[in-house]
UniProtKB/Swiss-Prot annotation:
The gene is pyrE. It catalyses: orotidine 5'-phosphate + diphosphate = orotate + 5-phospho-alpha-D-ribose 1-diphosphate. One of its GO terms (molecular function) is magnesium ion binding. CDD domains: PRTases_typeI. Its cofactor is Mg(2+). PANTHER family: OROTATE PHOSPHORIBOSYLTRANSFERASE, URIDINE 5'-MONOPHOSPHATE SYNTHASE. InterPro entries: OPRT, Orotate_PRibTrfase_bac, PRibTrfase_dom, PRTase-like. Its EC number is 2.4.2.10. Orotate binds at residues 118, 146. This is Orotate phosphoribosyltransferase. It comes from Clostridium botulinum (strain Kyoto / Type A2). One of its GO terms (biological process) is 'de novo' UMP biosynthetic process. Keywords: Glycosyltransferase, Magnesium, Pyrimidine biosynthesis, Transferase.
Length: 191
């Protein structure tokens, strides 16, 4: 499985885009990764997620939790490939929680699944819920790790690929200076 070129599959799926983007963080970028475009193609998603499943072979875990929306399909496919249960967390009144009869039992060893990890905010919210329920987070699995060097987590990251995507403050954005209009493709509501 190591001969899979994840970047090529992301590009073929139109999941890795070039242009001028306003990110959910408020920063601007010339590249954007929209893994939903990959996840709409089950055969391609299966290949990419197999790269993560391979990395998890030596990790001791018994359940996968994906935050809605981006982590739901990743959780399902990763659970299928690792033969572990896969569930999801979702927001209720803006607070991340485990619902729908899903549960984390005391002592469960949990992998959090994501499509893209940028700041780790969603993963950390899910980790807090898991730990409050008595579970232990043993790692974060994602298709794309696009964290900047200064973004650290307390958990190991198991990704299909690492992308370094430059971001800029609006005032320092060369694309804005060239009057190139931006697209706001993000999934998190900006306030």
């Amino acid at each position: 499985m190591s001969n899979i070129n994840v970047i090529d599959i992301l590009k073929e799926s139109d999941a890795l885009l070039e242009g001028h983007f306003l990110l959910s963080s408020g920063r601007h970028s010339n590249r954007y990764c929209q893994c939903a475009k990959l996840l709409q193609c089950p055969q391609k998603a299966e290949k990419v997620i197999s790269v993560i499943a391979e990395k998890l072979k030596e990790v001791d875990f018994n359940i996968i939790v994906g935050p809605a929306m981006g982590g739901v399909i990743v959780s399902y496919e990763l659970a299928r490939q690792t033969n572990k249960p896969g569930i999801f967390a979702e927001r209720k009144e803006e607070v991340m929680c485990i619902r729908r009869g899903f549960e984390i039992k005391k002592g469960d060893k949990v992998i959090i699944s994501e499509d893209v990890v940028t700041t780790g905010k969603s993963s950390l919210e899910v980790a807090k819920v898991i730990e409050e329920m008595g579970g232990e987070v043993v790692g974060i699995a994602c298709i794309v790790d696009r964290r900047a060097e200064d973004i650290k987590t307390n958990y190991p990251i198991y990704s299909a690929c690492k992308l370094e995507i430059e971001t800029y403050e609006k005032d320092n954005c060369e694309l804005c200076k060239k009057n190139i209009p931006f697209v706001k493709p993000g999934s998190r509501e900006q306030k």
